[in-house]
Amino acid sequence: DEAEAKAAPADCVPVAATDPLYILYTSGTTGQPKGVVRDNGGHAVALKWTMKAVYDTDPGDVYWAASDVGWVVGHSYIVYAPLLQGCTTILYEGKPVGTPDAGAFWRVIADHGVKMLFTAPTAFRAIKREDPNAELMRKYDLSRFKILFLAGERTDPDTLHWAENALKRPVIDHWWQTETGWPIASNCMGLHRFPIKPGSPTKAVPGWQVDVLDDAKAIVKAGTIGSICCKLPLPPGTLPTLWNADQRYKDAYLAEFPGYYKTADAGYKDEDGYLYIMARTDDIINVAGHRLSTGAMEEVLASHPDVAECAVIGVADALKGQVPLGFLLLKAGVKRASEDVARDVVQMV
């Protein structure tokens, strides 16, 4: 209180649109963490635009990004974007379960009149595991809650269906990265609402051209897995470089596919142009000459009624080069032997 009483007002300082606003470090699969630079002007323009175009929020709405300010979601959608749009933003310290129970998110939504929640699929998998019938949800008034957005990892169709059935509201999977600062692909709720396809973040957001390329740098046909890349130039708000590492920026993102930004994600487009993010490019495994997506296999495992969470990795095999190895976490209250569930999912794959 004493320090606050002695504090003097600080004037606003004009800065160039291209001046750095912040540096956010993100880990790479190899080497040192990369310091993603965010500039002032493009960042503000892009975030302000997304609040209506993507998230369909208006000034005065209550917006909740259940993330951490140390992550890009926290920077973009706890701090900057909601305030630029004139929304109330919620900063929440807690978990979706255990604080005190799996109704924590519903309590916050009801108490503060949240219109739009943005969180990770893991949060809903945790809620589903602890409260599979969504009984705690029914204790709260969610009448002002309109849309759930999921991002940060691939949303498996089983989690999306569970959330849709429980909430009876749109559940929107969308996709972006620390480097981009705002969504690359989404069903834009404030523009044109496309039919939802489970497993897909829908289509590229205006400003982005997203192509799927093969190792020869050619665009692949629909349904073929390849490297997901964004055509240059990138839209406002994306990273202009890495902090004190211009050459590393070029080598990491621009060199492999000339004329494109390499996302390092793998996936495909369907015949309707919907994008499917299946895995990081280093999560595509080669089994006896066949390129297989661990994400596609995880999707099958997650569809088993007893499975709450799962993961698939590639392990070395003397005959086939690699073989998939799956890990399962069962839902609370499951009585079946884990060996029986394992046999089920092997047959499903």
Descriptions of predicted regions:
Residues 2-25, 32, 47, 56-62, ...:
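Conserved pre-ATP/AMP-binding loop-to-beta segment of ANL
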Residues 20, 26-29, 51, 63, ...:
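Conserved S/T- and glycine-rich ATP-binding loop of Class I adenylate-forming
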Residues 33-35, 46-53, 106, 124-131, ...:
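Adenylate-forming
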Residues 44-62, 72-116, 129-136:
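Conserved AMP-binding/adenylation subdomain of ANL enzymes
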Residues 59, 87, 115-119, 128-195, ...:
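Gly/Ser/Thr-rich phosphate-binding loop
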Residues 68, 152, 176, 202, ...:
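Active-site glycine-centered loops adjacent to acidic/histidine catalytic or metal-binding residues
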Residues 110, 117, 230, 234, ...:
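AMP-binding/adenylate-forming catalytic core of the ANL superfamily
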Residues 203-207, 218-253, 292:
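Conserved ATP/PPi-binding loop(s) of AMP-dependent carboxylate-activating enzymes
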